[in-house]
Design a protein with these regions (language model features):
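Short, structural beta-strand-to-alpha-helix junction motif
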Residues: 4, 18-21, 341, 488
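Conserved short loop/turn motifs at secondary-structure junctions
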Residues: 10, 33-38, 165-168, 200-206, ...
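Fe-S ferredoxin-like electron-transfer domains
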Residues: 46-246, 250-254
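Phosphate/diphosphate-binding loops
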Residues: 62-64, 68, 209-270, 417-420, ...
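Short beta-alpha connecting loops at secondary-structure transitions
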Residues: 3-5, 90-96, 199-204, 240, ...
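Non-catalytic alpha/beta scaffold blocks inside enzyme catalytic domains
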Residues: 327, 344-345, 351, 355-523
Length: 524
């Protein structure tokens, strides 16, 4: 590959790459505001100006003092060029740190801060604001303007998710380009010129497409804030874990930001993955974290309706085993979950095999509104993983299960997860059975129909993996610890197997995952 030199280091580049792109790929940051690897080049912030010492120089006219003549004479010098727009060339020598570049960066910073409000103590971007970071790195001086700063609109609600502060805006146009190029909706633009510039909505429109939170995500300052995260947490108190979105079968990669002091998740952010979601997520995916602590099942229960009472886990497991043992294996339905990890589903499939139960079903949410950007028509994150767990066996649907209950072909049910497309009224046939055991993290129609419910850990509380619509297996990390006494579903299934007198052949997650390798090989 051809190479150029940046600040004394050789950088390989591909044909058509800019200096910025090649440096970014190598993990080298050239200061910038408007450039983003997933968006078109705007080159309007001028923070990424670099000095081309040899190669594709641009000449800038100047007056230079000629000592021999004792006067200023016309001359030229290399012009600083934006790295985001400068095409890399073989043997080019570039500096992003010499004195001339540093002076230019300090000037850009001073210019941007002339009218910028000192909102840092109340700004949600504080702690991850490039304007703050670059001030300390590239300016560090007081502004020289002593007059009243220009005032612009503040707290403007662009739509149901985003609030705009024009005084903080540096006009990088990232938000405009996200709407145009990612969401394919030209709903934002800018008006006026100079220090009167501001971002505006298209006439008669709101910022209400499916990717509005990406405008806040790409904003390098605090001009765009999310109504969900606004004023809720300081980012320096948050830790981050690697997750996978549970919103649909695309499986967008996420950063899960949480506060370890109170065990609360505050937001999701897209995690770059060129094969899956690139740099983006949809709004619904960004908000899936809100389900974590909503309608949680925290205690095992037995009985139905008004007779449902909480019990200890040991008592619940023993009663569940008693009810399942009372059903002939040929009439026992095992319901896997398209919401749970592949590991959880594999553990349940192993239990089904140990019991000799071949009636396998899948509980899944119904379809939602997909698109040709990121959103899959399949509302479930792991339909493919559940199928992989049973080595490609065709899983029947919940309506099939209900029909078999009504015909008498099914007389007992062991179900994983809470999510189905059906309501409790539609699941009424299950209430006629004496033995319906539900392993679930949340309440829902399926757990409500059960005779025994046993709480299990939520996705944010376990290590696991999903298989997305493209067949790509993606792992995720436990973000939080589950509530006291609650275990991952695969562990609870193993404990239930023990009560049923069955050995599933694994003792820990690593041993279970070896079964995934075996299942994948069997499916080929």
């Amino acid at each position: 590959m051809p190479k150029f030199t940046l600040d004394g280091k050789e950088i390989s580049f591909e044909a058509g790459e800019t200096v910025m792109e090649a440096a970014w790929r190598e993990g080298i940051e050239i200061p910038h505001y408007c450039w983003h690897p997933g968006l078109s080049i705007a080159a309007n912030c001028r923070m990424c100006l670099v000095h081309v010492e040899s190669g594709r120089q641009m000449a800038m006219p100047q007056l230079a003092f000629d000592e021999a003549k004792g006067e200023y004479v016309p001359s030229t010098k290399p012009k600083l060029q934006p790295a985001c727009q400068l095409a890399a060339a073989e043997d080019m020598v570039v500096s992003s740190t010499n004195d001339e570049v540093k002076t230019a960066q300090a000037s850009v910073q001073e210019f941007l801060l002339l009218n910028h409000p000192v909102d840092c103590p109340i700004c949600d971007q504080a702690g991850e604001c490039k304007l703050q970071d670059y001030y300390y790195e590239h300016q560090g001086t007081l502004k020289r303007k002593l007059t009243e700063p220009v005032h612009k609109p503040k707290g403007v609600r662009f739509g149901p998710t985003i609030v705009y502060d024009a005084e903080r805006c540096i006009m990088c146009t990232r938000c405009i380009r996200v709407c145009d190029e990612v969401a394919k909706d030209h709903v934002l633009d800018m008006r006026e010129r100079g220090n009167k510039n501001e971002i505006v909505l298209a006439p008669g429109r709101e910022l209400d497409h499916k990717y509005t939170l990406m405008t806040e995500h790409v904003c390098p300052v605090g001009a765009l804030t999310s109504q969900d995260f606004r004023f809720k947490a300081r980012v320096w108190f948050l830790k981050s874990a690697q997750g996978v979105c549970t919103g649909c079968a695309t499986g967008c990669n996420t950063h899960v930001d949480y506060d370890p002091r109170n065990g609360k998740i505050y937001r999701l952010r897209p995690r770059d993955n060129a094969e899956v979601n690139q740099f983006w997520m949809c709004d619904d995916g960004m908000m899936t974290y809100t389900r974590h602590d909503t309608d949680r099942l925290l205690m095992p229960t037995v009985g139905r309706g008004e007779e449902r009472v909480p019990v200890g886990e040991e008592a619940a497991l023993e009663l569940a085993a008693e009810q399942l043992n009372a059903v002939d294996a040929s009439k026992l339905a095992i319901v896997l979950s398209a919401q749970h990890s592949t590991e959880d589903n594999l553990a349940l499939a192993k239990l089904a095999a140990a019991l000799g139960a071949d009636g396998l079903y899948l509980a899944a949410l119904g379809e939602w509104e997909g698109d040709d950007i990121l959103r899959s028509d399949d509302h479930n994150p792991n339909r493919a993983g559940a199928t992989q767990a049973v080595s490609g066996t065709v899983l029947k649907s919940v309506p099939d299960l209900l029909a078999n209950v009504q015909s008498g072909a099914v007389q007992g049910v062991l179900a994983l997860g809470w999510a189905t497309a059906e309501t409790l009224e539609e699941l009424a046939p299950l209430v006629t059975l004496d033995g319906v055991v539900s392993l679930t993290s949340h309440v829902g129609a399926l757990p409500a129909a059960a005779s025994v419910t046993i709480p299990v850990a939520d996705t944010f509380e376990v290590d696991g993996s999903f298989v997305n619509a493209k067949g790509l297996t993606q792992g995720f990390q436990a973000t939080l610890s589950p509530p006291a006494g609650i275990e991952p579903a695969w562990k609870t299934i193993s404990d239930l197997a023990g009560k049923l007198g069955k050995d599933l052949g694994f003792k820990d997650l690593q041993g279970l995952r070896q079964g995934l390798v075996d299942a994948a090989e069997a499916a080929q």
